Amino acid sequence: MSAWSIDQARKTYSIPHWASGYFDVDAAGRMVVRPQGAGGPAIALADVVDDALGQGANMPMLVRFPDILGDRLAALQSAFAQAQADWEYTGGYTAVYPIKVNQHRGVAGTLASHAGEGFGLEAGSKPELMAVLALSRPGGLVVCNGYKDREYIRLALIGRKLGMNVFIVVEKPSELKLVMEESKALGVEPVLGVRMRLASLGAGKWQNSGGDKAKFGLSPRQLLDLWKSLRDAGMGDALKLLHFHMGSQISNVRDIARGMREATRYFIELSKLGADIDYVDVGGGLGIDYEGTRSRSYNSVNYSMGQYASSIVQPLADACAEAGLRQPRIVTECGRAMTAHHAVLVANVSEVEAAPEGRVPDLHDDEPPVVRHLRELHAELDERPAVELFHEAAHHHAEGLSLYALGQLDLVHRARIDDLFYAIAHAVKARLTYDEKSHRPLLDELNERLVDKYFVNFSVFESMPDVWAIDQVFPIVPIERLDEAPARRGTIADLTCDSDGKIDSYVENEDLDSSLPLHELRPGESYRLGFFLVGAYQEILGDIHNLFGDTDAIEAKVEGDGYSIVQQRRGDTTDVMLDYVGYALDDLRASYDAKVAAAKLPADESARLREALEAGLTGYTYLDDSPLE
């Protein structure tokens, strides 16, 4: 094995392939963040966490870097500017942020602070619209998607009265009647968009957000009926935006090109009917390479941001040239690409359950045959082919488990079976190599079987729900000690009392594996892991399984060559979570007091118990982050 180095650490955790220039390892073996991109100052993530802990924050902790949000937005705008220059496209471009991706004020507000025609906001519900109306600047583009009732439409029209460039996107035929009635009542001319349901389908975990099975959008017949209704009402000039959605996290750039070919036909045909379409909103789809493989895997993408922009601009440029049409302004809703990189969850390991090492127990006269067979196999390790020997050992191990279940082996011999089997497994693994093709399947099996369990102070369901819900992959890296070779392999489990509260796939060496190289814990020292690219959707979708709530969250902003912590938000406490599920806090306290009184303990002990109960009621929902001794 080659000597460990910082470059080896980068390669092991595939950092250059998913980091997009925002994350790296410094010479001291610490994960560093470059919030302004590859050329900007490097900030040690461990320093940020330690500073936040010193200011009263707790682990686990979500660390936000708002500068990354600005850099991602600038990169997206730059990619489209270059693509439009390449294809002589003069229609312009607006990057719209759909706040459903992450509605937190620090995220949406940071993005909304970027003024100009090149940025806008999208809402998909009444609460989101209320936030967008507050965040948007005069003249700012606001796209109103989602199901709409009369109040939603009224609020959107009020936005126009307040000077915002609000588009009400008709997603269902019934919405048009409400728009007509409310615009007349308010005395404001509506500006409309229409969402088409494309037949083209991009492969991926979210493929049904596009295509014929899409939840939203009009069919071709419904589009014709809508246009007729607008013309009959003298409102044909109100339709200014064509919207469609090809899917989310599209992995293959060819799927984007195919969807755009279909979408441009709708643009041309609507224009032929007399519609004056000024904006084409292509929705989302720009994916993130979570696993760093640059492939068509659902957790990856096989294209760059520049290639994505070109795949949008070129078909529209060609369509306009073919039909002799004015080039419309292009709008995207690439919220995942804007936000995923900006947030890192940092959590400490609370305990490690080591993989069984196995041992050869002392020989006993009363050993049953199954134990004796395993002992003999261990003695033959240097004399027989390793793969053949292991399969025979696995057979005897399974036989022993069956005998124990039938009551034909006692607990002592059951333990000896495990001791011998795992001793054989470790010895066989040491004799295998990936260079030998016939060894690879067994080596994969043993790498999955002979791993430690790292119990980490967080909840998968709260902080990374997509891991549980759709087998999403996120890069995971120790935030320090990367100058040391990791001596163990481990899997990660959370604090919840749920067998699904674990992570099964890990980014390693430009691939995915069932375990991750990790370090041994040191007594008295915290071992902290960073969970990267969690800035899109995860906080918003997180649930309160086992009543684990929001984690503490901080924002670290670049200042010169350093940083400052500009905001700190305390995570949920136990009383907040209990109140959320219907427990009256006064009733809880009264119940505790009654039970303490009924215990008839000495006054000083009763006081200590009441104090401990109150501390438990108002404390953080996660574990104390003190390192193990």
Model-predicted regions and their roles:
Residues 8, 74-82, 105-109, 129, ...:
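Short alpha-helical segments and helix-capping/turn motifs at coil-helix boundaries
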Residues 88-281, 286-291, 302-307, 315, ...:
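Active-site-proximal beta-alpha core segment in soluble small-molecule metabolic enzymes
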Residues 313, 317-629:
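Charged (often Lys/Glu-rich) extended helix/loop segments that serve as interaction or gating elements
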Residues 64, 71-83, 91-93, 101-104, ...:
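Secondary-structure-rich domain cores
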Residues 20, 25-103:
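Low-complexity, highly charged intrinsically disordered N-terminal segments
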Residues 1-31:
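Charged, compositionally biased N-terminal leader segments and the immediate start
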Residues 30, 38, 68, 102-104, ...:
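Short, glycine-/Ser/Thr-/acidic-enriched flexible segments
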Residues 67-75, 225, 262, 311:
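A non-catalytic, amphipathic alpha-helix used as a structural packing/dimerization or gating element
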